[in-house]
Swiss-Prot record:
Source species of the chain: Xanthomonas campestris pv. campestris (strain ATCC 33913 / DSM 3586 / NCPPB 528 / LMG 568 / P 25)
Function noted in UniProt: Catalyzes the isomerization between 2-isopropylmalate and 3-isopropylmalate, via the formation of 2-isopropylmaleate.
Subunit description: Heterodimer of LeuC and LeuD.
Keywords for the protein's UniProt record, in alphabetical order: 4Fe-4S, Amino-acid biosynthesis, Branched-chain amino acid biosynthesis, Iron, Iron-sulfur, Leucine biosynthesis, Lyase, Metal-binding
Taxonomy, superkingdom: Bacteria
Entry protein name: 3-isopropylmalate dehydratase large subunit
Pathway assigned to this chain's UniProt record: Amino-acid biosynthesis; L-leucine biosynthesis; L-leucine from 3-methyl-2-oxobutanoate: step 2/4
InterPro entries listed in its UniProt record: 3-IsopropMal_deHydase_lsu, Acnase/IPM_dHydase_lsu_aba_1/3, Acoase/IPM_deHydtase_lsu_aba, Aconitase_4Fe-4S_BS, Aconitase_4Fe-4S_dom, IPM_dehydratase_rel_enz, IPMI_cat
Pfam families, per database record: Aconitase
UniProt: [4Fe-4S] cluster binding residues: C353, C414, C417
Assigned protein family: Belongs to the aconitase/IPM isomerase family. LeuC type 1 subfamily.
Database matches in PANTHER family: 3-ISOPROPYLMALATE DEHYDRATASE, HOMOACONITASE, MITOCHONDRIAL-RELATED
EC number: 4.2.1.33
Cofactor: [4Fe-4S] cluster
């Protein structure tokens, strides 16, 4: 029997038929919807007189456009000041009501970012195919699922048929062996990977993260690395199932129960790459070599360790790369060879589908505890990824730690990750952000984004500039 990768197994489990052109019809187990990419899809169903093929396979929640201040949320839909944003959230409510789809509406305690809500509800299960009209759907691959983003026309196709046409990708394995040093996190791993292979390194591949350092990560850490596989060029990121996966899923609302649970677990334990499976490409990193990472430019691959400097374009031999560095330096307002620790900041954002789970908030709070946000920081936001994360953080007293330190404690949503709601950067402002993209204007027109881990973001907030979180004293960690 031919040895198979995890991706091979998941593909074969869901391949309905293979077409003459080499593409396949793939069955979709779970479809997650939000307000931005679904309106035209629902309208397409109406115009064609169709109904969803499997209503129970869909769940929805608004996240991109929702405001995050308590006052705005208490005001309901009418408090959304931007007309287009308000219409999108309202339309999602109406579409889900009309088609009978379960939605966690804006002020439901279960509402949150789609890629936080799906896993915490157990709607994402090992072995599933999971799609959503959002490129960071790769997050769900942390559960040994085949998950990727889709476009609006494909959202309609899944609603109508529960299937998609796709071509099988190549297999890429990223192995991270060893033990992560203190202060180095899952976010630092994935930024280091992107810095090594570039934003095109995973093009055309399904990326499986493996190795002892990956196995040592919590499920939340695995979600972080899979979330940013798309920034490495791979639509699909995944981690094989193990006992951590099963323990995380057990007892969640959508998880199987009783005999169904036992049968599911037996299957899930097979969702690993065979020992002698062949990958088209293998990339290796040593965990001990990874340091806290900070992006300096306008692409996630423009990233260096905290103890390094902004690159000098004059040292780059490739003219295309040299031009790219020069453009990024100009946009970011940085100088060649500037130490990362000399980058001063205006705002700090802790949140997004990459880093807004309870583990992320605990890590940031451990740094913030007993400290104060620097007087030069205009705003430091902490935005939980869901209402349930927010409630848990408040039960643990994390909100008080942040508030005492001078951070703002917000309601769940995508927030400052992208400029589609009131949380935005001003032109020329530098932000230490736990999000996933640092493109020009991503957080607001002219805004300058630096991608970091939650601990590094909190350290920057209390220092006013980037510092090595490992050098701060008195940080309490939780196992």
């Amino acid at each position: 029997m031919t040895a198979k990768t995890l991706y091979d197994k998941l593909w074969e489990m869901h391949e309905v038929t293979r077409r003459d052109d080499g593409s396949s019809l793939i069955y979709i187990d779970r479809h997650i919807l939000h307000e931005v990419t679904s309106p035209q899809a629902f309208e397409g169903l109406r115009l064609a007189g169709r109904k969803p093929w499997r209503i129970d396979a869909n769940i929805a929640t608004p996240d991109h456009n929702v405001p995050t201040t308590r006052a705005e949320r208490q005001g309901g839909l009418e408090s959304i000041s931007d007309e287009v944003s308000r219409l999108q959230v309202q339309t999602l409510d109406e579409n889900c009501d009309d088609f009978g789809i379960l939605e966690f509406k804006m002020n439901d305690t279960r509402q949150g970012i789609v890629h936080v809500v799906g896993p915490e509800q157990g709607a994402t299960l090992p072995g599933m195919t999971v799609v959503c009209g959002d490129s960071h759907t790769s997050t769900h691959g942390a559960f040994g699922a085949l998950a990727h983003g889709i476009g609006t026309s494909e959202v309609e196709h899944v609603l109508a048929t529960q299937c998609l046409i796709a071509k099988k990708m190549k297999n890429l394995q990223v192995r991270v062996e060893g033990t992560l040093p203190f202060g180095v996190t899952a976010k630092d791993i994935v930024l280091a990977v992107i810095g090594k292979i570039g934003t095109a390194g995973g093009n055309g591949h399904a990326l499986e993260f493996a190795g002892s350092a990956i196995r040592a990560l919590s499920m939340e850490g695995r979600m972080t690395i899979c979330n940013m596989s798309i920034e490495a060029g791979a639509r699909v990121g995944m981690v094989a199932v193990d006992e951590k996966t099963i323990a995380y899923v057990k007892g969640r609302p959508f998880a199987p129960k009783g005999a169904d649970w036992d049968a599911a677990v037996a299957l899930w334990r097979t969702l690993v790459s065979d020992a002698d499976a062949s990958f088209d490409t293998v990339v290796e990193l040593r965990a001990e070599d990874i340091k806290p990472q900070v992006s300096w430019g306008t692409s996630p691959e423009m990233v260096v360790a905290i103890d390094q400097q902004v690159p000098d374009p004059a040292a780059e031999q490739d003219p295309t790369k040299r031009d790219s560095i020069q453009r990024a330096l100009k946009y970011m307002g940085l100088r060649a060879n500037q130490p990362i620790t000399e980058i001063h900041l205006d705002r700090v954002f802790i949140g997004s589908c990459t880093n807004s789970r309870i583990e992320d908030l605990r890590a940031a709070a451990a740094v913030a505890k007993g400290r104060k946000v620097a007087s030069t920081i205009k705003q430091a936001l902490v935005v939980p990824g869901s209402g349930l994360v927010k409630a848990q953080a408040e039960a643990e007293g994390l909100d008080k730690i942040f508030l005492d330190a001078g951070f703002e404690w917000r309601e769940p949503g995508c927030s400052m990750c992208l400029a589609m709601n009131p949380d935005k950067l001003g032109s020329g402002e530098h932000c230490a952000s736990t999000s996933n993209r640092n493109f020009e204007g991503r957080q607001g027109a002219g805004g300058r984004t630096h991608l970091v881990s939650p601990a590094m973001a909190a350290a920057a907030a209390v220092s006013g500039h980037f510092v090595d979180v490992r050098e701060l004293q008195g940080i309490e960690t939780r196992e």
